């Protein structure tokens, strides 16, 4: 390696980090339950779905980050500047519902982990998750963006180790893994499961947030950029290159976790009943692979809940600021968004039911995040010389069409009682 290469790498390192925060959305408790269920029911059959999902996610998150870097604004802010007040309020309401639904699933997941590990009642588990997430948000809100990112990366490492540890006890079949890369189905139920996995690929709040994260990160690392500096060819090209590297590694790790969960279930839980809930999956892992592996899995689930709910609250703050031009203290937002989850936990609602309801709300929000992203990044008036080229435009719109169609399909199945 030459001295020049080393210097270039050192310059890129400070620019890495935002994608690892966004990647937490791809390993939240809802994803855990979906991938465990897929592996337990169908073995290695649907590995290819997760591989395709990860590729889709990389493209979507890159476009969000690119939009933020080129314009210096977040996706919500750009949309807010182009809408009349009634439109902005309506768009904010749907985005806020999506953010609340996301937070609901993540708080419940963290509370379940505390219940599995320590027997903590679900309501008090939700309170603890909320308090810890507020502590994490205090770090981010105190102008310590790099420290916040470091904590989230640390939690992502715990998630990875917690969810993949079981593979050392029950290694997957190499031939099964290779066979799972061939796109195919096994009956109509497997099509539904695949649609669930692929349809949940892109979380709306991660799309909104990534366009803001890159600018918060740059301001923290390098200081606020002037318009001329931001749009200088060398500076922006370096940022975009770092962003591609950041997204590749962050989402590769998230994809590895998701695929690993499916492989673990395929190797150790195939054919077992009751694995369609997080509690059932934990019980099956503990009984099949031993209590130590079950405990490590629950620790990974706890890290997943803590990290994802902190990131979700961060996203909600950016959505409100961009669309309504109101900067509510993030602690106040955290307390407000925590209330629905605590009410559901306190009422004794079945956690799996709550997760299903939250996923339906997320499905409604997907088109409102992805379609504007595609339109803006294809608009030369917005992106200038960094407008998506034709292959990227076609790829992006095809991915968006597939994801939106699958989410609408899942909403239909859920509302008609077929999902």
Q: What residue spans do the PLM features occupy?
A:
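Extracellular/periplasmic helix-exit of transmembrane alpha-helices
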Residues: 57-70, 214-218, 222-229, 252-280
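Membrane-interface "cap" regions at the ends of multi-pass membrane proteins
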Residues: 1-30, 86, 157, 193, ...
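Hydrophobic alpha-helical segments and their helix-loop junctions in multi-pass secondary transporters
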Residues: 156-182, 191-212, 373-381, 406-418
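Juxtamembrane transmembrane-helix boundary signature
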Residues: 22, 49-82, 91-97
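Loop-to-transmembrane helix boundary motifs in multi-pass membrane proteins
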Residues: 86-88, 123-126, 292-294, 298, ...
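Helix-loop-helix module between adjacent transmembrane segments
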Residues: 56-61, 86-106, 114-140, 199-200, ...
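Flexible loop linkers connecting adjacent transmembrane helices
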Residues: 2, 34-39, 62-87, 139-146, ...
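Transmembrane alpha-helical segments of multi-pass small-molecule transport proteins
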Residues: 92-96, 117-139, 157-162, 327-343, ...
């Amino acid at each position: 390696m030459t001295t020049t290469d080393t210097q270039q790498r050192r310059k890129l390192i400070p620019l890495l980090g935002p994608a690892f925060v966004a990647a937490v959305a791809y390993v939240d408790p809802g994803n855990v339950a979906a991938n465990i269920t897929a592996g337990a029911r169908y073995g290695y059959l649907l590995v290819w779905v997760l591989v395709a999902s990860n590729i889709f996610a990389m493209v979507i998150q890159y476009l969000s980050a690119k939009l933020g870097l080129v314009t210096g604004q977040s996706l919500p802010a750009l949309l807010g500047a182009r809408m009349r007040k009634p439109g902005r309020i309506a768009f904010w309401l749907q985005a806020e519902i999506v953010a609340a639904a996301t937070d609901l699933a993540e708080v419940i997941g963290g509370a379940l982990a505390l219940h599995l590990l320590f027997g903590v009642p679900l309501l008090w588990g939700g309170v603890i998750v909320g308090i810890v997430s507020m502590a994490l948000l205090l770090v981010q809100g105190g102008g310590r963006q790099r420290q916040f990112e470091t904590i989230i990366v640390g939690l992502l490492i715990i998630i990875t180790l917690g969810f993949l540890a079981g593979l050392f006890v029950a290694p997957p079949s190499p031939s099964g893994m290779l066979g799972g890369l061939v796109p195919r189905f096994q009956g109509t139920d497997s099509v539904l499961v695949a649609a669930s996995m692929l349809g949940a690929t892109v979380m709306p709040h991660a799309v909104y947030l990534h366009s803001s994260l890159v600018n918060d990160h740059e301001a923290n690392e390098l200081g606020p950029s002037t318009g001329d500096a931001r749009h200088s060819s060398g500076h922006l090209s370096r940022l975009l290159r770092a962003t591609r590297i950041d997204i590749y590694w962050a989402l590769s790790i998230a994809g590895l976790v998701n695929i690993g969960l499916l492989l673990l279930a395929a190797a150790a839980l195939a054919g077992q009943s009751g694995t369609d809930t997080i509690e059932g999956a934990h019980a099956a892992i503990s009984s099949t692979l031993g209590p130590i592996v079950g405990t490590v899995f629950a620790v990974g689930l706890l890290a997943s809940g803590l990290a994802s709910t902190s990131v979700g609250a961060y996203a909600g703050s950016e959505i409100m600021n961009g669309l309504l031009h109101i900067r509510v203290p993030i602690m106040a937002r955290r307390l407000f968004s925590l209330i629905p989850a605590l009410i559901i936990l306190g009422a004794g609602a079945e956690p799996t039911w709550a997760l299903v309801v939250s996923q339906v709300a997320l499905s409604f929000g997907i088109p409102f995040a992805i379609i504007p992203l595609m339109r803006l990044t294809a608009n030369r008036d917005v992106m200038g010389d960094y407008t998506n080229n034709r292959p990227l435009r076609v790829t992006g719109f095809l991915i968006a069409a597939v994801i939106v169609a699958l989410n609408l399909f899942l909403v239909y199945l859920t509302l008609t009682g077929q999902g």
